[in-house]
Amino acid sequence: MVTAPPATAAGPRDVTADVLGGRDVTLTGDTVVTVPSGTTTYDGVFRGEGTLTVRGSGTLILTKDSDFTLPESRRRQKVTTQGGNHPYVTTTNPDPPAITVERGATLQYGNGGTTGLIGHFPYNTPAFRLNQDNIRVDGTLRLSLKSAYNLGTISGTGLITQPRFLWGTWDLSGTHPFSGVIDNGTQVNAGRPEFATSLPNVRKILNQGTYTVDTPLGRTVTMGMDFYQREYGSDINVQSRPGSKVVLTGQYSWSDQGGDTDPSLSDPALNWTPARKNINKRGTNIKGANVQWGDGTTNKIFMPGTAETVYINLLAARSRSLLTFDYNGPVTLGAPIGGGRFHDTLAAPGAGDVVIAGTRGNDVTFAAKQYYDGSTTVEKGAVLRLGSAQGDGSLWMDGDLCRVVNDGTLVVRNASTPVSLSRVSGSGAFVQSGAATTTLAGSGVTYTGTTTVRKGTLALRSGATLTRSREIRLTSAGARLDVGASGLRVTTTLTGKGTVKGAVTNEGVVAGGLTVTGGFTQRADGRLVLRDTPLKVSGGAVRLAGDLDLSAAGNDPDREITVLDNQGRGATKGAFKGLREGAEVKFADTVHRITYRGGDGNDVVLTAAAESPSASPAHAPASGAPTPGTRSASTADDSGLGWWPYVLAAGLLGGLLIPATRRTRRGRRRGGRHAAHG
């Protein structure tokens, strides 16, 4: 039976009695239903023109599809299909709501079947049916449908919820002012090639099913809400078309409190600890998409957890995937990135690339073994760390596409798990700071930034060299550079307090304070810089040529200064340029004589000698003018980059520091780095 409209109407028409009686209702304007407490199942339908408001304290279940529209005078929205051969739909100036669910009331579409939706579908939209009947939800809207459906434009502050395991599909198209909570128990398509989705005011989504983000061609979609999960098995799938990007700025967390309306986690540490029956296991599948975690304004990582609580799959679909980390502070990825199926993420390597964006403060730690076949790019200004107190980390390097492009800073700080890296390029810095050994292997190690060993061992193997590295620094006594059988060829600078295991050939700048366990050869274009302690060579031959630089030795030298402590048995061969055995050297107003047979018979030692008045004009102090070549030892700080890169650069461009000797008008030599006599 269909109820007849009244002859006159003052305010909204109340059809509660008709609904409770199961009668069909024809709308002729604004209409209300007051639902009593408990559950009311309505087997009738709504039709006509008007609006429907559901209020009260109970639940109204619709079992049949209803079709009505707003009065023509209130229709204003414009629906456009654009994109040519790749069509997508946009809605501008949306109509006011045709359905309103007031606070305290619950409207349920369907009862576990395929019918029960309110909607009008006049648009010939591609691949989905756009609903003209927009809805405002300040109470609760429950979607108990197995079919595919669309709700038009959604507003309000309430709860929209799906029961679990129905596997209906909600096509959530367009931009929605809704600011409440979405409880996805089944499947939400938040974007497709045919539409983009924007939810700028949504605070939280409780994801207990599959939440899929997709885009039309050439569109950037941002999801700024936090996602929560309560049960094992939920995931977020991300897809995108060529030229598109999906930006996720919130966090995907477990929830142990707050129910459906305000999910939250009592302790963030619970994301990193397996719960009973793994109910806090959640994941994301990136399917040939360009995905960015963060937008440079937050330091909450999207997927907090370990391999036991989260999974991350980087997959190829139409194209390889790209995952960018863009944060403004330190974040830790405690789980591996793989390419398996759902929870079995390590069944196959990931198919995509990873970027650490060059946002100021972006400092990302990988605290797990990564397993993706692709490039890892650290942009200028960014930091990527492998390993932390939460666990050791590494990059998989066995795939054909595996490589590291480092224009920022790459830090390896594993406690116990060795790391091997090959194909490392870029202009950025490399830092070894963990107890476990890091190995650079192969001829693909070509980066040009500074190499710093703070702790543990950095090893070079299979043809890897540091000839392009701007500076090599061993900043602690426990720092160790293992150069293997090939030895280390220094073409830039080598400084610090640590040990080089293997032979060193100096064609650049080497500073005292280091220990070399193999031989030490300094060629004609090399320079040895005297520091507070001598260069120690504990094994192998010592062959000298090139320059000795005393400008960093201080202004109050001892009467006897050891420049090179040759702890081997063989004689020191060769001599510094212009400093044959017994030659005089003046610095800090003191004349010293050099010997290559000092100490235990083969050390290079400077011994103070009495200054003769006639010789005084010939000895200019080496620490005179404040040029790079005459900096004191206190200015060469191991905690920073040091000043030797600038020394080397100045040398390459302008004759290398201060000339070893210069002639006066009378043709006599005066001291530069050193003044030699004999």
Describe the residue ranges of each PLM region.
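C-terminal low-complexity, Ser/Thr- and acidic/Pro-rich disordered "stalk" regions positioned immediately N-terminal
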Residues: 597-639
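Generic detector of short, aliphatic-rich beta-strand segments that form the cores of beta-sheets
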Residues: 107, 142-143, 211, 323, ...
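Cleaved targeting-peptide boundary
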Residues: 10-17
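Extracellular, surface-exposed repeat/solenoid domains
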Residues: 278-279, 524-608, 649-651
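C-terminal membrane-anchoring or membrane-association module
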Residues: 642-678
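Extracellular beta-strand/loop-rich repeat segments of large surface/secreted proteins
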Residues: 426-431, 436-439, 446-448, 488-560
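C-terminal segment of classical bacterial N-terminal signal peptides
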Residues: 1-8
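Extracellular repeat-rich scaffold modules on cell surfaces
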Residues: 23-114, 145-206, 215-306, 317, ...
